[in-house]
UniProtKB/Swiss-Prot annotation:
The lineage of its organism: Bacteria, Pseudomonadati, Bacteroidota, Cytophagia, Cytophagales. Pfam families: Anticodon_1 (PF08264), tRNA-synt_1 (PF00133), tRNA-synt_1_2 (PF13603). PROSITE patterns: AA_TRNA_LIGASE_I. This is Leucine--tRNA ligase. Belongs to the class-I aminoacyl-tRNA synthetase family. Its EC number is 6.1.1.4. The gene is leuS. SUPFAM superfamilies: Anticodon-binding domain of a subclass of class I aminoacyl-tRNA synthetases, Nucleotidylyl transferase, ValRS/IleRS/LeuRS editing domain. ATP binds at residue 701. It is an enzyme of class 6 (ligase). It comes from Amoebophilus asiaticus (strain 5a2). A motif ('HIGH' region) lies at residues 41-52. It is found in: Cytoplasm. Transmembrane segments: none annotated. InterPro entries: aa-tRNA-synth_I_CS (IPR001412), aa-tRNA-synth_Ia (IPR002300), Leu-tRNA-ligase (IPR002302), Leu_tRNA-synth_edit (IPR025709), M/V/L/I-tRNA-synth_anticd-bd (IPR013155), Rossmann-like_a/b/a_fold (IPR014729), tRNAsynth_Ia_anticodon-bd (IPR009080), Val/Leu/Ile-tRNA-synth_edit (IPR009008). Keywords: Aminoacyl-tRNA synthetase, ATP-binding, Cytoplasm, Ligase, Nucleotide-binding, Protein biosynthesis.
Length: 923
């Protein structure tokens, strides 16, 4: 083979790896382990796009490098196959999700294999396989059968809580539980019937039913998480989302808030990700106090949580969340209609949107007043959408002088602003600094903020109207989805009380349905399943688990994927331990990464695993960006208006498949055939055409802006794609995809090939390498290894290119040097490396060969280029041998022609020579 035939080479070695099970992984106690994992993909579209391989290639480079350093490497891959993305794709294509998911998984595996990724495919898992989700259901049952002991800071079996209730009732039990729990004695507990006991236990279980306000999308027919809603629309599909009360399964993740915070300290994660989790958990220390309100002839108490009890005398109003139970109750008759309208509008916005929209102030006065606990002055009570029902008590005391959101609210509605902390000017903005002394504050006057905080809490406690409290922003995780394509929740109902399906009857398999589409009323598709009951005739839960259920523990299953007795065996878990390096997108910071930590800590508490944290080190690969196209739907219609005419209408931007667009012009017929709901679409055109909007953003299936890597592999080969993807820039940075530079990377691989082959055939010799060749190759060994260790893959590729250029210039065809070159190239371009390794005469795979060691002797420079400065300003650079005495350097510098012109006729006061650093002439 005289030319670089990448197609033949890549097919040959991919088949070789498969036939010889080169990447099959076993437990080797004599070797150190290394567990490297990619976040597994959703197989929800037509396959991978060029943005996906960025993290996969990076992890593969590290996996191959670690094998070459003597580690036993676990590097698996699987598929996050349940959930909304896969189901929506099935609905769009009119096929059953089981069919589309299986087809997409096959396509993904084919694409991953053709990239030369060194996965152990024997360990492949899919979250939609009954053998897998049997254990997802089993873990849910463990959550249902557990409670959290605050005194011990760990989960315990529910049977132990029952024993405590039998012995002492619940009055002394320190447990994470519902806010309102009825107290009972041991005797009262013992007198209860079974149904009453189960109802009480539900308030303590870590998996429990609750009435909660959710993001409901009628079009998608399901509840959405906050992160799945943007500007009141579903992130997937752009459908309207409303807020409504529903009975949902939830997981009591709030029990783990302090441990989730503490665990972050020891993780080698990006600081930004740790900060996102801290903010999402939102631990705040402050005080909770009660305000009395008399409205409509009745007295009520409004508890308020504040992190600034020192500013109590700056309160000028109270604000309730639109969802607050008193919002309607205390409203006066004249305000009621307007308040009802406002509450409806506000509650239909997601909490994320309400928090983010700092420039848009809205609110409604209830007509009622509360009494200030110290001044006894009346405080107007408002409803405001910047107050969230789930944080604190759902009510805030407005202190405009010292809180920016309160300040904006007070300015907008012309409410009083009373400054109580000295040091700032509140004429234009709130003074939020936590320094200064108190004034306008009665018994707190003259105190520092710290001392005033302490005194205010003591006063509240002495009056019996408040206490110190720690609160959290994190809510319990809603676990129900009113969809079909998910794990059935293994619960049945007896007299409306939930009970777990017996473990020996798992998996509770998802039944095959003729119609699996969601319903706008909220009735889950499983309601149409015939005989969806236990063998005793009890109805089974109709909701399914959310998309994140299967991904919350999958990293354990890779360790022991065929174990039928346990989700992971102790031998496998003891050897592989935690994931050493995890790669995936930063968008999962407050979702998957938090839930996986929660499930791991829970399983640790019950003794099923021996680690508390699943991922020791984390890398977020930057986005590979693509050019997106947009159409503009006129709200409430199926009509779309062209880009330059959109401002005349109230529209919603919607992503459209870039393959339906050419030069920003939409193919109308193909667009109407794209999805069933678009077949009746009409258009407002400009000059007879529909012009699309465009934007460079994340390449994503949901944005329909993906580019297929198959075309790149077909034209240039997988090794070129691997190298080019790494060469684009630092792994963590976002990078726009374009094909302009890929030709140069392909030429680099051709140049590597030509070190081994010319047209006449192989040209390898056994000659002793020259000093120059040794220097080039050992410098590359050192730099490439250092780059891999710090995940600087782009500079590693650059150093490989520099080395090959130097070897080409030196006309190197020496076996020893080229052997080392192939070894350091192998993690990046494994197919070509395998072929060249074979040409060098080796019988085994290069994947089993050790990484070369550089020798310091070849890195020592014989000369050094000295910068020559005159009065501190560099005027020239001259090379001298590194061992030349300083006197000789001084002599040659002063006589060098490039220096003579600067010192001619000048008196030289001193010459300072610093060996292998610089020379400075003082004149």
């Amino acid at each position: 083979m005289s030319h670089y035939d990448f197609k033949a080479i890549e097919q040959k070695w991919q088949q070789y790896w498969k036939n010889n099970q080169i990447f099959r992984t076993t437990i080797e106690p004599s070797k150190p382990k290394y567990y490297i994992l990619d976040m597994f993909p959703y197989p929800s579209g037509e396959g991978l796009h060029v943005g996906h391989p960025l993290g996969y290639i990076a992890s593969d480079i590290v996996a191959r490098y670690k094998r070459s350093k003597g580690y036993q490497v676990l590097h698996p891959m699987g598929f996050d196959a349940f959930g909304l993305p896969a189901e929506q794709f099935a609905i769009q294509t009119g096929q059953h999700p089981a069919i589309t998911t299986a087809k997409n998984i096959g396509r993904y595996k084919q694409q991953l294999c053709q990239l030369g990724l060194s996965y152990d495919w024997d360990r492949c898992i899919s979250t939609c396989e009954p053998a897998y989700y049997k254990w997802t259901q089993w873990i849910f049952i463990q959550l249902f059968n557990s409670w959290y002991d605050i005194s011990l800071q760990k989960a315990r079996p529910i049977d132990e809580l029952i024993t405590l209730f039998d012995q002492q009732g619940n009055q002394q039990v320190q447990a994470s539980c519902d806010k309102e729990v009825s107290l009972f004695t041991a005797k009262e507990w013992q007198a209860m019937d079974e149904e009453s006991k189960q109802q009480h236990l539900l308030a303590y279980r870590l998996a429990f039913l609750e009435d909660t306000t959710v993001n409901w999308c009628p079009e998608l027919g399901t509840v959405l998480a906050n992160e799945e809603v943007k500007d009141g629309l579903s992130e997937r599909g752009g459908y309207p989302v409303i807020r409504k009360q529903m009975k949902q399964w939830s997981l009591r993740i709030t029990a783990y808030t302090d441990r989730l915070l503490a665990g972050l300290e020891h993780l080698k994660w990006p600081l930004s990700t740790k900060e996102m989790q801290r903010n999402w958990i939102g631990r705040s220390i402050g005080a909770e106090l009660n305000f009395t309100v008399i409205a409509n002839g009745q007295e009520h108490t409004i508890p308020v949580f504040t992190t600034r009890p020192d500013t109590l005398f700056g309160v000028t109003y109270l604000a309730l969340s639109p969802e607050h139970p008193l919002a309607k109750l205390i409203s006066t008759g004249t305000q009621q209609a307007a308040i009802d309208t406002y509450i409806t509008q506000a509650t239909n916005r997601s909490e994320r949107d309400r928090l983010a929209d700092v420039n848009h102030v809205t609110g409604m006065f209830t007509g009622a007043y509360a009494i200030h606990p110290f001044t006894k002055q009346p405080l107007p009570i408002w409803i405001a959408d910047y107050v969230l029902a789930g944080y604190g008590t759902g009510a805030v005391m407005g202190v405009p002088a010292h809180d920016s959101r309160d300040y904006a609210f007070a300015q907008h509605f012309q409410l009083p602003i009373i400054q109580v902390v000295a040091g700032g000017d509140t004429a234009q903005s709130a003074y939020e600094a936590r320094e200064g002394s108190l004034f306008n504050s009665q018994f707190l006057n003259g105190l520092s903020i710290q001392e005033a905080t302490k005194q205010a809490i003591q006063k509240l406690e002495s009056l019996g109207i408040g206490k110190q409290k720690t609160t959290y922003r994190l809510r319990n995780a809603i676990f129900s989805r009113q969809r079909y394509w998910g794990e059935p929740i293994p619960i049945y109902y007896k007299n409306n009380i939930p009970y777990p399906i017996p473990a020996e009857e798992l998996p509770l398999e998802l039944p095959s349905l003729a119609s699996f589409k969601p319903t706008p009323t909220g009735e889950p598709p499983l309601g149409h399943a015939p005989n969806w009951k236990t063998k005793e005739g009890y109805p089974i839960e109709l909701s399914t688990m959310p998309g994140w259920a299967g991904s919350s523990w999958y990293f354990f299953r890779y360790m022991d994927p065929n174990n039928e007795a346990s989700f992971v065996g102790s031998t496998a878990q003891n050897y592989w331990q935690a994931v050493d390096l995890y790669l995936g997108g930063a968008e999962h910071a407050t979702g998957h990464l938090l839930y996986a930590r929660f499930w791991t800590q829970f399983l640790y508490d019950l003794g099923y695993v021996n680690i508390e944290e699943p991922f020791q080190e984390l890398i977020h690969q930057g986005m590979i960006q693509g050019k997106s196209s947009f159409v503009y739907r006129i709200k409430g219609t199926n009509q779309f208006v062209s880009y330059n005419l959109r401002h005349a209408y109230e529209t919603t931007a919607m992503h459209v498949d870039i393959h339906l667009v050419k030069n920003n012009i939409l193919d109308l017929e193909r667009f109407k055939n794209w999805r069933p709901d678009l077949q009746t679409a009409t258009f407002v055109l400009e000059n007879g055409q529909y012009i699309c909007g465009s934007e460079v953003e994340k390449m994503s299936k949901s944005k329909y802006n993906t580019v297929n890597p198959d075309t790149v592999v077909e034209q240039y080969g997988a090794d070129t794609l691997r190298l080019y993807t790494m060469f684009l820039g630092p792994i963590e940075q976002a990078k726009p995809w374009d094909m302009h530079g890929i030709e140069g990377v392909f030429r680099f691989l051709v140049k590597v090939w030509r070190l081994f082959y010319l047209e006449k055939g192989a040209i390898i010799t056994n000659e002793v390498p020259t000093k120059e060749v040794q220097k080039a190759i050992h410098k590359a060994i050192k730099k490439v290894e250092e780059d891999i260790k710090r995940y600087a893959f782009n500079t590693a590729v650059s150093n490989l290119m520099i080395c090959v250029n130097e070897l080409t210039a030196l006309k190197c065809n020496n076996r020893a040097a080229l052997t080392n070159l192939v070894l350091i190239l192998a993690p990046f371009a494994p197919h070509l490396a395998e072929e060249l390794w074979e040409i060098l005469g080796h019988q085994h795979s290069i994947a089993q060969a050790p990484f070369p060691t550089y020798e310091e002797i070849y890195l020592q420079e014989e000369t050094y280029e000295y910068p020559i400065a005159i009065n501190g300003k560099v005027r020239a650079k001259i090379n001298f041998p590194v061992d030349m005495p300083q006197g000789q350097i001084e002599e040659q510098v002063l006589t060098h022609e490039s220096i003579q012109k600067w010192i001619q006729g000048q008196q030289i006061k001193r010459v300072i020579v610093i060996s292998s650093k610089m020379v400075n002439i003082v004149i």
